Amino acid sequence: MKSKIIFTTIIAAALATGCDKFLDVHPKGEKINMFETAEEYEDALYGVYSELTGSNLYGQHLIILPEVMSQNFTTSDYKYAELAEGEMTSSGSTSTKKEIWKDAYEAINHINNIVEHAEDDIDTYKHSRLYLGEALALRAFVHYEVLKLFGPPYWASDSEKKTTIPYVTKYSFDISPLLSYDEVCRNILEDLKRA
């Protein structure tokens, strides 16, 4: 009986101390270093690709919306039908655009987290430069897609000076300022050169 009590006490003590890190709860938005191995960089990049295939991005809206807006095909879906008719302020079209904006910048924020950690670990892992380059190219790509939808057409007069979208380069939940078309394009090209 005495050995059962000792055995149970040892098991309980091991379980209570072994879960310490697992049970830690971090406030939402707190930056956590989840990149302790090269595989974790790959997992984070796979996570971003998975985000990009969501229905608000390349899984649906980001593919269909430009086609409908350019009237390459018609649809009976009320959100897309309104956009095809040039109605940009109705509730259906506005919610679609908000969903794209939110999910795109959420993906960009996750990409920025990878970029910041990859820059710190540039000489730590065999493929650190590859992870950094891939993340920078993804950041440029997603910003370019957002610019295409929410920025002025490039052929419009003074389009290069018009305020368009924020170009977010830091992992943060703060609101970033809107930049001109030229500044966004310059940032895209800079990220692509670095990649």
Question: What is the role of each PLM region?
Answer:
Residues 1-28:
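Bacterial Sec-dependent N-terminal signal peptides
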Residues 19-63:
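Membrane-proximal, proline-rich intrinsically disordered regions
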Residues 39, 66-91, 170:
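A structural signal for short, hydrophobic/glycine-enriched beta-strand patches
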Residues 45, 108-111, 185, 192:
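Inward-facing hydrophobic residues that define packing positions of alpha-helical scaffold repeats
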Residues 53-58, 72-75, 142-153:
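Secretory-pathway/luminal and periplasmic proteins that interact with or process carbohydrate-rich
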Residues 80-150, 177-183:
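Conserved, well-structured interaction surfaces
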Residues 149-186, 190:
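Short coil/linker segments at helix-helix boundaries
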